[in-house]
Amino acid sequence: PLLIADLKEEYIDALLRQEQITEIKKQLFYPGYIDNQDLAALYNTAFTFLYPSLRESFGIPILEAMACGTPVITSHTSAMPEVAGEGAVLINPEQPQQIADALIKLENDADFYQKQVDYGLERVKLFSWRNTAEAYSKIYREIQKKQSLET
C-alpha cells in the first residue's frame, strides 16, 4: 500500500481522477493530517519515505524518517540535498521515472537499501540538539572573542 500523508483533498481528488491510477486505487491510503505522536510508527513501518517537494526551507520530515531507519527519496532541489546528504536518494521531483527508478533500486538491491538506512542514521546525528547547541556555543564564543579583541 501507498500512504499519502498530509496532502490537500483537492490534490487527492485530482490524483484519483487520473486514468492510470485506477488499477492501484485500492492500495492507496490517504488519512490526511497525521498527528506528530503517530509519525514514528508510520516511519518505522514504511519501506521508504518519498519527499518530492519542490521548495523547502529545511525538510524536517527527511530527518524524522532517517532517524527511524527509513530510506529517503527526496528532491535534488532547494534545501533537501543539504539536509539529506548521502542519506537519501536524490531525484528530480518533476520526473516520475526517476522516482520509479529509485523505488525499484531500493526494492531490488538489499545492499543499497541497507546503505541508505545506515547513511541516514549517521546523517541525522549531525542535527542532534547537542550538536546544534555546540555549534551555537562556538559561534557565540567566536563573537565574544572578536568583541574582546576590538575593545
Describe the residue ranges of each PLM region.
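Carbohydrate transferase catalytic cores enriched for Leloir-type hexosyltransferases
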Residues: 1-151
